């Protein structure tokens, strides 16, 4: 009597491996995009924490704190404001004449996700009716990595 052979054939195993490869090819780019968006949100969160200090300094002195090299008006030096993926946040006078002050977050060139390494996110402040309006933008990040409020 012949023994019954059980198990998977080579073709079945190859089909399973091909399906796993296709699923991985779809999932990996989606995960990388998600990771970059999460890291961009760290920059936005760090800048959100500085909004009131930047606005208070401007309302009290009519000067935008520039923390390029030193602590300025109670805002830490640029290189001291960082995160896991954010190298620094620079507060300064706005480069766009429609705004008063701005904060520029620069991503690390090593730890950040590849699509955002060394790139920047800008948060600009404008005085409107005695209050502040903030605008988020980036000249070098793809829209897919920016929060909805920053997409233009």
Curated annotation (Swiss-Prot):
Keyword match Transmembrane: yes
InterPro entries for this protein: N_methyl_site, Pilin, Pilin-like, T4P/T2SS_Core
Membrane topology: Single-pass membrane protein
Biological processes annotated in GO: cell adhesion
Location of N-methylphenylalanine modifications: 8
NCBIfam families linked: IV_pilin_GFxxxE
Family according to the record: Belongs to the N-Me-Phe pilin family.
The protein's name in its UniProt record: Fimbrial protein EcpD
Organism name: Eikenella corrodens
